[in-house]
Amino acid sequence: MSVNVPLRKWRSADPAILIGRRCIARTNDDVVIDGRLELIRRPDGAATLRFQGIGNDIIDHDPNTCSNSMSDGIRSLAIYGKE
């Protein structure tokens, strides 16, 4: 049996290491979404992590501050290690 431990430092993590990790997010409308993350890079250097197969942005990456933040409409989230 494996135990998932939340990735506590997701706000400062390189977005590339979050690819494929399990994420559980709660939206402002109290909808819970559970799935794996995929990375979308933009030409300006910014990046977005979203659920695979779903177009919802979950995490926004700011290359100027090297930090991650929850996208608009996301109230809380947890990111877990790869299994």
Task: State what each model feature region is.
Residues 26-34, 72:
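Short coil-to-beta-strand transition motifs
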